[in-house]
């Protein structure tokens, strides 16, 4: 007798209200108990829409055909209480799910809503906190937590319901590399020790693939590959358009035509036969000629309230004209705050910011708004209109008058948004919202770009195109300062990296020196082969240096 699938989708197609293009096309999928499924695919490929079709409360509004079942029951017929308890969902933005003031209130909230007695609530919270190990956070205000801690609380608030199926939509998109590793490690424990089934949508596959029992790759609302991680990665390798989605370590070994593909640093090192064969010379890094300082922060200190801790303390930094600078560091170290101060959106408690030699707050606001482009880590903060078209067209018309319509059309096509022009910005995927915010910001051709997590939510292919666009802007004289958790992107593209810690810049160097000196804040490729190739940061760096006869036969 066949086992009943934990969740099952039969020939599901879906079109959002007021749209013509199908978001999902003929999806058939069976999820077995205990699986750890990674959903991969481009921005807007249907991953989030598919996840929402596995929980009845999240079913999007539109026209659908086909059926979805949970434990053999049609999803629409699953009792509300059962759905709330057994199917949990964690979203991309840590801020969006928190509703209470303290951590313990957040954990108790959902249990109180389903009417559990207080002694059961206390027992569940105590047991869960012991499992997760964050007793110290229990009575803290959720507003004082870092992004990683907030996402941990979101996960805990779902786990306290003792779910059987856990859905996660890019849960590490806003987490620093260390917090992301900790979060994903916790998901592995939940899956292995508690037997909870996990379906996870994620662009950063480097850390997810080794955990997954199965990978599903989507494109244009369809499932194109479905199978074991090794099988799906091999299938993706056969199609040029999917190769950017393959994580760095397996990508390197596929380039080497290896038969058995490793996914982790340990597996990769075990496959290397003879490191002495490396044809590489550690030449000194060429120092670039220093340029004029265009932006400076001098002895900046900042706190949100008079008696609150300092976010930035006596921070001094100089940005040279035409440079692309990455700010990295843990959630809560002040990267976003520094960007808003550099943009003139917030004023430092002490110290001065100068742009082109002028104190930033003494520059006319209209001139500042046109010449300095700022994109928040929450792109929806930028949206004021009801359609993607209006967001871009109204700004283009304001800047260019009668030419605005033509320029808006060109800009939307440039950022792969033209097909979405009638969609409400808040109905776009996280990556599409990111592109829309960039699209409108770049209309004024700013000479200084201040970007907070610009690659968040972007699939690897679009990320490469955005990287190329920023390089082109650099060549035209644009200066870029970018806060990012995307170590691979920074390693590949930027000129300079700065690490913030305890409110100050503690490291400031070119990418090769910066990342080769780090243990955690570096790329998977560098961790794999740092002793032999200390400055290798990408698979391309290693491929150029290492012949493929170094592999075990």
From Swiss-Prot:
Q: Known SUPFAM superfamilies for this protein?
A: P-loop containing nucleoside triphosphate hydrolases
Q: Name one Pfam family in it.
A: ABC_tran
Entry membrane topology? Peripheral membrane protein
Q: Which GO terms describe its cellular component?
A: ATP-binding cassette (ABC) transporter complex
Q: Which residues belong to any copy of the ABC transporter domain?
A: 7-245, 295-527
What PROSITE patterns does this protein's entry cite? Answer: ABC_TRANSPORTER_1, ABC_TRANSPORTER_2
The keyword ATP-binding belongs to this UniProt entry's keyword annotation: yes
Tell me the residue numbers annotated for binding ATP 1: 41-48
What is the annotated localization of this protein? Cell membrane
What InterPro entries does the record point to? AAA+_ATPase, ABC_transporter-like_ATP-bd, ABC_transporter-like_CS, ABC_transpr_CbiO/EcfA_su, ECF_ABC_transporter_ATP-bd, P-loop_NTPase
Which GO terms of the molecular function aspect are on file? ATP binding; ATP hydrolysis activity; ATPase-coupled transmembrane transporter activity
Binding site residues for ATP 2: 329-336
Presence of the UniProt keyword Cell wall biogenesis/degradation in the record: no
Q: Which domain of life is it from?
A: Bacteria
Q: What is its EC number?
A: 7.-.-.-
Any idea which UniProt keywords this protein has?
A: ATP-binding, Cell membrane, Membrane, Nucleotide-binding, Repeat, Translocase, Transport
Its function? Probably part of an ABC transporter complex. Responsible for energy coupling to the transport system.
Matching entries from PANTHER family are given as:
ENERGY-COUPLING FACTOR TRANSPORTER ATP-BINDING PROTEIN ECFA2, HEAVY METAL TRANSPORTER
Q: Which family does it belong to?
A: Belongs to the ABC transporter superfamily.
Q: What is this protein called?
A: Putative ABC transporter ATP-binding protein BCE_3323
């Amino acid at each position: 007798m066949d086992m009943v699938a934990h969740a099952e989708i039969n020939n599901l197609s879906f079109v959002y209200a007021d749209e013509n293009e199908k978001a999902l096309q003929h999806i058939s999928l069976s999820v077995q108990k205990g699986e750890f499924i990674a959903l991969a695919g481009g921005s807007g490929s249907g991953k989030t829409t598919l996840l929402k079709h596995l929980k009845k409360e999240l079913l999007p509004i539109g026209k659908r055909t086909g059926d979805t079942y949970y434990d053999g029951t049609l999803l629409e017929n699953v009792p509300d209480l059962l759905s709330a308890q057994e199917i949990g969902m964690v979203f991309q933005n840590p801020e969006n799910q928190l509703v209470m003031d303290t951590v313990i209130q957040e954990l108790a909230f959902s249990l109180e809503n389903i009417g559990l007695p207080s002694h059961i609530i206390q027992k569940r919270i105590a047991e869960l906190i012991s499992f997760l190990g964050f007793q110290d956070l229990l009575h803290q205000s959720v507003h004082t937590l870092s992004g990683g801690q907030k996402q941990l609380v979101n996960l805990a608030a779902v786990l306290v319901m003792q779910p059987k199926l856990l859905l996660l939509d890019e849960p590490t998109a806003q987490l620093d590399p260390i917090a992301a590793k900790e979060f994903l490690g916790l998901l592995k424990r939940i899956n292995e020790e508690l037997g909870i089934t996990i379906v996870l949508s994620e662009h950063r596959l480097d850390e997810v693939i080794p955990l997954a029992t199965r990978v599903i790759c989507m494109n244009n609302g369809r499932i194109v590959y479905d199978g074991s991680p090794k099988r799906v990665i091999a299938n993706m390798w056969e199609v040029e358009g999917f190769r950017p989605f393959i994580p760095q370590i397996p990508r390197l070994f596929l380039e080497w035509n290896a038969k058995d593909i490793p996914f982790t640093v340990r597996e990769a090192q075990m496959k290397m036969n003879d490191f002495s064969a490396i044809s590489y010379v550690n030449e000194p890094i060429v120092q670039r000629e220093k340029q004029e300082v265009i932006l400076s922060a001098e002895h900046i200190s900042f706190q949100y309230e008079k008696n609150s801790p300092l976010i930035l303390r006596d921070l001094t930094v100089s940005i040279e004209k035409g440079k692309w600078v990455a700010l990295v560091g843990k959630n809560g170290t002040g990267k976003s705050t520094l960007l808003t101060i550099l943009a003139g959106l917030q004023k430092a408690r002490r110290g001065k910011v100068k742009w082109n030699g002028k104190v930033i707050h003494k520059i006319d606001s209209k001139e500042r708004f046109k010449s300095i482009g700022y994109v928040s880590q929450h792109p929806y903060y930028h949206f004021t209109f009801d359609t993607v078209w209006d967001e871009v067209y109204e700004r283009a018309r304001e800047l260019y008058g009668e030419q605005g319509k033509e320029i808006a059309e060109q800009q939307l096509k440039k950022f792969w948004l033209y097909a979405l022009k009638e969609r409400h910005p808040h109905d776009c995927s996280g990556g599409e919202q990111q592109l829309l915010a960039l699209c409108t910001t770049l209309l004024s051709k700013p000479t200084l770009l201040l970007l907070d997590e610009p690659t968040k939510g972007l699939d690897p292919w679009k990320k490469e195109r955005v990287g190329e666009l920023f390089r082109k802007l650099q060549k035209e004289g644009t200066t870029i300062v970018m806060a990012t958790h995307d170590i691979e992107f920074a390693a590949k593209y930027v000129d300079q990296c700065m690490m913030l810690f305890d409110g100050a810049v503690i490291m400031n160097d070119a990418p090769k020196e910066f990342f080769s000196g780090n243990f955690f804040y570096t790329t998977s490729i560098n961790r794999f082969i740092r002793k032999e190739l200390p400055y290798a940061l990408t698979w391309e760096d290693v491929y150029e240096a290492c012949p493929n006869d170094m592999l075990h036969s």
